[in-house]
Amino acid sequence: MGNRRLALLIFVLFFLTGFTNLSAQSPTIEPSEKQLSTGEPFIYKIEPDAKGGEAYKLVYLVPVPIEVLWRFKTDFHGDFLETNKYIKNQRVIREKQNVVIIENRLSSRLGSKFRWRNILFSNKYRLDFVLENPEQCDQKFHYGHFQLEPLGAHTKVSHVAYFDFFGASLWAYYPWEGGMYAFLDYIARWEQETILKVKDDYE
């Protein structure tokens, strides 16, 4: 048996016996400015929704001003989106005032079309999102928000999400590629790198 397979078996056994039943952090948990300045993403498992499931908070620093990052994050038509390895394709279904409905296909579930309602609060640099068709995506619910805050000439991003689906807890604790931590680490680093390539379009 290979080392990776053995480690996975041990992890699953620990998971099934309650080894990973660790206390979740408060949603208000934050890294310090000094920690953020390293450029590293900070990932926290936070208290879940009262209905159950799992939740996370991802906090990271992006090296552009807040207005530039806000335009970038709310550009749902951008070609750059499909450079993200987890997004196969995306299209905008409807836009009305501060609400944008998008549909995308993810590499992890090519057979499902995820339809997201995004509510933009431009004066607060906040974007709320909710999965409108959870049953079609084998989920019970999935919602959260992005909050941007200026930090000098850079922007602090706080990404919070609450979700539930079969295997959600296993995904949340899985420590390798394919688990929550690897996914969120990639998302943050992809955004940090991608905005630098296209920022001239949003200045």
Indicate where each model-derived feature is located.
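Hydrophobic/aromatic beta-strand elements that line small-molecule binding cavities or substrate pockets
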Residues: 57-60, 90-91, 113-120, 143-150
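Short beta-strand segments that buttress and anchor functional surface loops
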Residues: 45-46, 101-108, 129-136
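Mid-length scaffold segments of soluble, non-membrane domains
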Residues: 81-121
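Hydrophobic ligand-binding cavity/cleft-lining segments
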Residues: 22-95
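Beta-strand/loop substructures that line and gate deep hydrophobic ligand-binding cavities in soluble
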Residues: 132-182
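Short, highly charged C-terminal tails/helix-capping segments
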Residues: 192-203
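Bacterial N-terminal signal peptides that target proteins for export
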Residues: 1-9
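Bacterial N-terminal signal peptides
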Residues: 9-18
